[in-house]
Amino acid sequence: QLEIKEAQVDEALRRLGGLDGFELEPIVPAAEQWRYRNKLEYSFGSVDGELCCGFHAPGSWSEIVPLEDCLLASERGNEARRVALEALRPLGLAPYDRRAHTGFLRNLVVREGRRTGDLQVRLVTSPGPFDGSSFAEAMVGVGATSVIHSVAERTGETTHGGRDTLLAGSPEIEELCAGLRFSLGAEAFFQTNTEMADVLYGTAAEFAGLKGWERCYDLCCGIGSIGLVLAPNAGEVVGVEIVEQAVEDARRNAALNEITNATFIEGNVRVVLKELAEGPARPDLVVVDPPRSGLARKAVARIAEAAPKRIVYVSCNPTTLAPDAAQLAEGGYRLVRVRPVDMFPQTPHIECVALLEREG
């Protein structure tokens, strides 16, 4: 798997990006091959008239395959899913029909704080009456510290954007990573492999090479993870994120860790970066951690216009890293080094950290 993934990164950068002259470092192997995920999202369905909970069948958005044990989830996470299903079956609630858009039970999201012992169980349903007391009691019985009922009003397959009701415990859980404590709300994005997130963020900090005085922009910052890891060795960190709740989470995480030199701005990266770059405070370093789709071309152009000395690009998709790095090369940057990190064994997904430096 490691050889295949490393070759895929090399091919993407050279073939799709037309890039060369960079150092492709050996892929960092995962600490654990199985049961490494701290979060999994399951879907409800029906088999022979009985409620089930599992994953979509390959290539299908309507068929749900039940499972007894997911080998990427912990034993505790699997137990939480099984007990949740046992608690819901007697209630006679219908699973959501993804063709007819009828039914009630949609998704079950199980998230753990692997290093804190916290456990959050979130039930996602369609609108309608629901007495969640017996469900919450069952979840607390398996150690859940946060039990949430989310109502999704959209017809699409999504666990985001609903109305949340706290059934038991706290609305957030906490996790320890890279020497920091992170508070995670119901919809907060956080790397799903805690052990390898340490490696990923450590690599980003290594590539950043901070001396203690630099101004850093953390773009697509989410809940502030990377920026807060960099902050103790930086002069100033400015995080930019389009999701309002994520910005609130980032500010809360800064306060939780007593970090005072990091600020977070809500807005589109392209727009905010233009405003920041027009001011006197130019960045020395830009860190970007975009979604799988990569960056918009205008956002890449804005980064080049801001003219930081270094860019650290944290990528979850080498096929979008390649064209983004190629566009930055056209804007005066050189791809120096790339280090793949195997965050997700037994899957085709690859994380990379890339360092680009401004030429001249």
Describe the residue ranges of each PLM region.
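Short, acidic/hydrophobic/Gly-rich beta-strand patch recurrent on exposed beta strands
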Residues: 54-58, 122, 250
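Short, low-complexity Ser/Thr-rich regulatory SLiMs
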Residues: 44-46, 112-114, 342, 358
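Feature of Fe-S/electron-transfer and energy-metabolism proteins
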Residues: 31-37, 83, 104-107, 217, ...
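Broad gene-expression machinery/nucleic-acid interaction feature
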Residues: 35-41, 50-52, 105-107, 118-120, ...
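N-terminal auxiliary segments of SAM/dcSAM-dependent transferases
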Residues: 90, 94-168
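Rossmann-like S-adenosyl-L-methionine
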Residues: 132-360
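Extended interfacial segments that mediate partner engagement and assembly in macromolecular machines
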Residues: 1-97, 115, 129
